[in-house]
Amino acid sequence: MNLHGKSVILHDMSLRDGMHAKRHQISLEQMVAVATGLDQAGMPLIEITHGDGLGGRSINYGFPAHSDEEYLRAVIPQLKQAKVSALLLPGIGTVDHLKMALDCGVSTIRVATHCTEADVSEQHIGMARKLGVDTVGFLMMAHMISAEKVLEQAKLMESYGANCIYCTDSAGYMLPDEVSEKIGLLRAELNPATEVGFHGHHNMGMAIANSLAAIEAGAARIDGSVAGLGAGAGNTPLEVFVAVCKRMGVETGIDLYKIMDVAEDLVVPMMDQPIRVDRDALTLGYAGVYSSFLLFAQRAEKKYGVSARDILVELGRRGTVGGQEDMIEDLALDMARARQQQKVSA
C-alpha cells in the first residue's frame, strides 16, 4: 500500500461517540480540556453532542451530565482553529435542535440514518445545506448492504444537498477489502466535488487497517477518537493512526506528540473501564451488532443473569439496528425466562 503524498482530514469522536463509553457522563470541565487539547494538537474537526446525537437525552438513550447546548456553548468559544460538528439522527434530533447547534457556532452537521433509510434525512440535510453549513450524510451499519446499495442511498443524500457522504462501520464488522470496495465505488460514482468519509470501530481490531484502506480508495475524511474512546472497543485510536499516517507519508496536519499527550494525560484518566477488544466487544464485531449496544447488553447481563455475549449474538441474528436499544432488555428477559423454563422441564 503506497499512500505517500496523500492528505486526509481527521475528525475526532471522543466527545460524542465517547459519550457511549462514559454513559454520557462527561463534565463540562473534561469536555473543554479535551477539546482545547485537540485544538492545540491541530485537530480540524471535533464532534460534540450526546452519543446518539442532538436531542438524544432520553430514557431510551441515556441522560447526559449536561445538555447539548451547554456542552457546545462551553467548548466552542475556547477553540482557536478547530471546528465543531454535531451529529443528528432524524427521529431523535429535530430541525429545532439543528438550528440551536448552528446558533451555538457548530460548523458541520452530520445527518445519520440506517444504511437503507437515507430518505428520512431529506428535511434535515436540506435545512443544513440551506443554512450554508458543511453538510454530511452518514450511512450507519453499512456492512449490512452491498456496495451498490450503499451507493444508491448515498446518491439520495447527495441529491438532498450533502457535500460529504460517510460509509459507517457502526459494528466494527468490516474487513479492509469491503471498505475498499464500498469507499471506492462511492468515490467513483458520486459527484467529484462530493467528499467521501469513513467511520470505523475497533471491535475486530481492524479500525486502523480499514481507515488506511479507505484513504487508499479515495476517502478524504476519516473519523477516529483519541485513545479510542467510543462505543464497543472504541473508534480508530487517533494518536496511533496519526503515527501510522506519519510513517506512511500521509499528511494529517496533527502534532503527533501533542495528540499522544491528550490521549494519555486527559482521555485515559476519564475512562470508566479500559477501551479494548474484550470478548463482548469482539462479539459485537463478529456478529455485526451496533457498537453502542455493548453497555446495554452488559447491564442486562447483571440484571437478568444472561450472558452479554449470548444477548449480542442473538441481536446480530435478528439484524437489529441503531435505535432499537429498547429491544435489548426485552430480549434478555425472554432469554432468562426460557432458561428458567428449561430448568423446570429438566
Swiss-Prot record:
GO terms for biological process: catabolic process; L-leucine biosynthetic process. Mn(2+) binds at residues 17, 199, 201. Keywords: Aromatic hydrocarbons catabolism, Lyase, Manganese, Metal-binding, Plasmid. The record marks 16 as: Transition state stabilizer. InterPro entries: 2-IPM_HCS-like, 4OH_2_O-val_aldolase, Aldolase_TIM, DmpG_comm, DRE_TIM_HOA, PYR_CT. One of its GO terms (molecular function) is 4-hydroxy-2-oxovalerate aldolase activity. Belongs to the 4-hydroxy-2-oxovalerate aldolase family. This is 4-hydroxy-2-oxovalerate aldolase. It comes from Pseudomonas putida (Arthrobacter siderocapsulatus). The gene is nahM.
